[in-house]
């Protein structure tokens, strides 16, 4: 089984400026359609129509929509790893680290919405993409697990499994981001802004780790 850390098989490098512009147009169109319909309902004809290109043009760059998403997954992994560095830097308080973790997850999801939707949906039907999704989720799960262990060293989350807590928090992050960024259209009040969403995630995350039970007298 291939993994996201392996470079996927791809066609020869696009040789001309025109070719690069065409591929960029196809990628942009695919992201637009996938964000709207999801990867499973998206066809190559949909992507070509959105890009204003022929279906044959798509196959000059990708063998299939799955091959396109594999290339995206590699690019996404590199960006996600860079965002993690903001959370791991020294000198942050526990509250600041929770805020940075929420911000990194939100902005990664917003900036790579089509990738997140594509890989998560294909993971339900394809073993390779299930592995890709597991690797993508492992990035935040790993550093949140370490945050839980640090909280336990301070007397919080006693008796809990750090990795299970981290897995639950990442699942919550993913579902929240999906619903806010790709879910049903917002009501009359409109969708919450970025900072409100980040603060909501950070508050839930921080309170989940740094709570103290109050026992009734």
Protein language model annotation of sequence segments:
Residues 71, 82-114, 165-169, 198:
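Hydrophobic alpha-helical connector segments
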Residues 18-31, 47-48, 72-80, 84, ...:
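Generic hydrophobic, amphipathic alpha-helix propensity
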Residues 25, 33-67, 71:
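Helix-turn-helix
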Residues 87-91, 116-123, 180-184:
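Secondary-structure edge/capping motif, primarily at the C-terminal ends of alpha-helices
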Residues 130, 152-202, 212-217:
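Hydrophobic/aromatic-rich alpha-helical bundle segments in the mid-to-C-terminal region
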Residues 111-143, 163-164, 191:
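Short secondary-structure transition hinges
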Residues 1-21, 185, 213-217:
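N-terminal intrinsically disordered/low-complexity leader segments
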Residues 99, 103, 138-149, 163-166, ...:
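An amphipathic alpha-helix signature
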